[in-house]
Swiss-Prot record:
The keyword Cell wall biogenesis/degradation applies. GO terms for molecular function: lyase activity. Its EC number is 4.2.2.n1. This is Soluble lytic murein transglycosylase. It comes from Enterobacter cloacae.
Length: 42
């Protein structure tokens, strides 16, 4: 079965967002994005 692109995109965004929330609540100080990611033009 195939998953529509928009659903996949939404799922990935949610996973990344909840990963950031979890890290914050657990007291981890990791950066959300690397320096290379901040400098990249999307």
């Amino acid at each position: 079965e195939s998953i529509p692109f928009s659903e996949t995109r939404g799922y990935v965004k949610n996973v990344l967002a909840y990963d950031a929330y979890y890290r914050h609540f657990m007291g981890e100080k990791d950066a959300l994005m690397s320096d290379a990611e901040w400098q990249r033009r999307y």
